[in-house]
Amino acid sequence: MSSQDVLIHSDDPCHPANLICTLCKQFFHNNWCTGTGGGISIKDPNTNYYYLAPSGVQKEKMTPEDLFVMDAQTLEYLRSPKLYKPSACTPLFLACYQKKDAGAIIHTHSQNAVICSLVFGDEFRIANIEQIKAIPSGKVDPVTKKPMALSFFDTLKIPIIENMAHEDELIDDLHKTFKDYPDTCAVIVRRHGIFVWGPTIDKAKIFNEAIDYLMELAIKMYQMGIPPDCGIGEEKKHLKMASP
């Protein structure tokens, strides 16, 4: 086995090379990563290596041999598959690692994200929904010193940036959202999809699933005439009544 192949072969299902393939298949079946769209990157905390899904591979068929591996310090590729090129998302993934101290980043072409980007302006907003409690607030508990989640009564805000012809051209707007929304764990790209990050792949997956649930709910609320961020008890003021 070559030194490059050692990086991606493991019997551990939670090894980044195995986990990326497992999650890409799952996201394909969720209709989030079809037609080779989307991608995942995971930082291995044991080696400080970035594992990156390639460009142009069908996500449900991805294998560990398809993955790129990069040294987090030198940003040099330690492993490059012959059949594929690096994901166009790579500069965006690196920005999340370097500026947000992410441990993993998920990029999907979720239809819910795309529709929300057409309905909302500069930011997606939803409030007073239980699932919001799965999203980090960006604050730290003064007693336990642990990260705090948003509460039921909080408003989740996710910035929306404009799409570009090429994904690497999104980098300037991504850096701006880091500055304008320092507590966010996601950014929606209009007519494109969403990027979600977290301190670990488990957290990033939870955040991504919760946000997609909330976006789907917001779309249904919008169809009923209910603003997704309306106050508790105000729903019926906006509700579109069915014709008798």
Curated annotation (Swiss-Prot):
Please list the residues that bind substrate.
89
The keyword Protease appears for this protein? no
Biological process per Gene Ontology, one example term: L-methionine salvage from methylthioadenosine
**Location(s) in or outside the cell:** Cytoplasm
Against SMART domains, the record matches this protein to: Aldolase_II
This protein's cofactor list reads:
Zn(2+)
Q: What is its EC number?
A: 4.2.1.109
Catalytic activity reads: 5-(methylsulfanyl)-D-ribulose 1-phosphate = 5-methylsulfanyl-2,3-dioxopentyl phosphate + H2O
Residues given in the record as Zn(2+) binding sites: 107, 109, 192
A GO cellular component annotation in the UniProt record:
cytoplasm
> Which molecular function GO terms apply here?
methylthioribulose 1-phosphate dehydratase activity; zinc ion binding
Fetch the Pfam families from UniProt.
Aldolase_II
Q: What does this gene product do?
A: Catalyzes the dehydration of methylthioribulose-1-phosphate (MTRu-1-P) into 2,3-diketo-5-methylthiopentyl-1-phosphate (DK-MTP-1-P).
NCBIfam families per record = salvage_mtnB
UniProt lists the family membership as follows:
Belongs to the aldolase class II family. MtnB subfamily.
- Cross-referenced PANTHER family: METHYLTHIORIBULOSE-1-PHOSPHATE DEHYDRATASE
Protein name, as recorded: Methylthioribulose-1-phosphate dehydratase
Organism, as annotated: Saccharomyces cerevisiae (strain RM11-1a) (Baker's yeast)
The upper taxonomy is: Eukaryota, Fungi, Dikarya, Ascomycota, Saccharomycotina
